[in-house]
Amino acid sequence: MEYASDQLLPRDMQILFPTIYCRLNAINYCQYLKTFLVQRAQPAACDHTLVLESKVDTVRQVLRKIVSTDAVFSEARARP
């Protein structure tokens, strides 16, 4: 099944991240890395940092639920 995001990705990215779950995981990791780099450059934590951290945490929770739900359905399909 081809998703709309497939057309936006360069071919090498499609090869590196063949499934939608690989792509979601890569996005999650990139968000984490970007947040880490930005926060490391700041001398002190501020309200903006807390808001950003909460948003990133929310995205992580959503991604975990998607992958968890898929795992449950995959197990159910595998049972005879």
From Swiss-Prot:
Task: Name where it mostly resides.
Answer: host cell
Which GO BP terms apply? viral DNA genome packaging
Q: Which domain of life is it from?
A: Viruses
Keyword tRNA processing assigned to the entry: answer is: no
The UniProt keywords, alphabetically, are:
Host nucleus, Viral genome packaging, Viral release from host cell
Which GO terms of the cellular component aspect does the record hold?
host cell nucleus
The UniProt entry's sequence similarity note says:
Belongs to the herpesviridae TRM2 protein family.
Tell me, what does this protein do in biology?
A: Component of the molecular motor that translocates viral genomic DNA in empty capsid during DNA packaging. Forms a tripartite terminase complex together with TRM1 and TRM3 in the host cytoplasm. Once the complex reaches the host nucleus, it interacts with the capsid portal vertex. This portal forms a ring in which genomic DNA is translocated into the capsid.
Q: Quaternary structure per UniProt?
A: Associates with TRM1 and TRM3 to form the tripartite terminase complex.
Q: What's the protein called, per UniProt?
A: Tripartite terminase subunit 2
Native species: Human herpesvirus 8 type P (isolate GK18) (HHV-8)
